Amino acid sequence: MTKLIPLLLVVLTFAACEKDPDTDKLDNKYLVYTNYDSKADFKAFQTYYMPDSILVIGDKKEAEYWKDESAQEILQAYATNMNNRGFVRVDDREEANLGLQVSYIKSTYYFNDYGRPEWWWNYPGYWDAPYWGNWGGWYYPYAVTYTYSTGSFITELLNLEATQGEKEKLPVLWTSYMSGLLSGSTSVNTKLAVEGVNQAYAQSSYLTNK
């Protein structure tokens, strides 16, 4: 479930994932990890909604969104992979079965017990409850613990058809984490990120409705 594709000394443990790779063998490609809810029936979903920007999680109190050409190229990689798996992207999240959320971490953060997603709820304006609907956040039906540094992407595929309410949480059906060293070239960084996105889907053959 793991593959070497830009690496920032990452310690990442996913339940049901394979043994951590030998860091001596890592190159400048992204290190990609993926995980999913084994009970999810992805063939039951047809449409997905993905924002037109990448959430940047950093040191600022205000929400920051990455929307430039590089961000659009990375988001297009997600869209292409989702479309190739038989999912249809829609412009209105109210019409979507799934929500695809991409976040970028530009500062060093350490998280233990990722099973509690409250880690970003204190950031005003981030992908909070009003954005996805009237619900109390979301949850992971599997255990995850990891730390990561600058140059990391976290992607979550949410089940928007799950029961919503003040206490109910939307389940995360699939998540990918990729991290890598950043070069001084924007084009190189973007290229490596796109390769990482493609690898995340390549190692997630179950993520399809075909």
What residue ranges belong to the model's regions?
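Low-complexity, compositionally biased segments in intrinsically disordered regions
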Residues: 98-153
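C-terminal motif of bacterial Sec signal peptides marking the signal peptidase cleavage site
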Residues: 13-16
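C-terminal/domain-edge helix-coil "capping" segments
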Residues: 18-21, 29-39, 148-172, 178-210
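Positively charged n-region of N-terminal signal peptides that target proteins for export
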Residues: 1-4
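Extracellular/periplasmic catalytic domains that process cell-envelope and extracellular macromolecules
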Residues: 41-43, 92-94, 146-150
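N-terminal segment of the mature soluble domain
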Residues: 53-104
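Start-of-domain marker
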Residues: 18-47, 55-71
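Structural recognition of the beta-strand scaffold that forms the well-ordered cores
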Residues: 47-50, 99-102, 154-155, 172-175
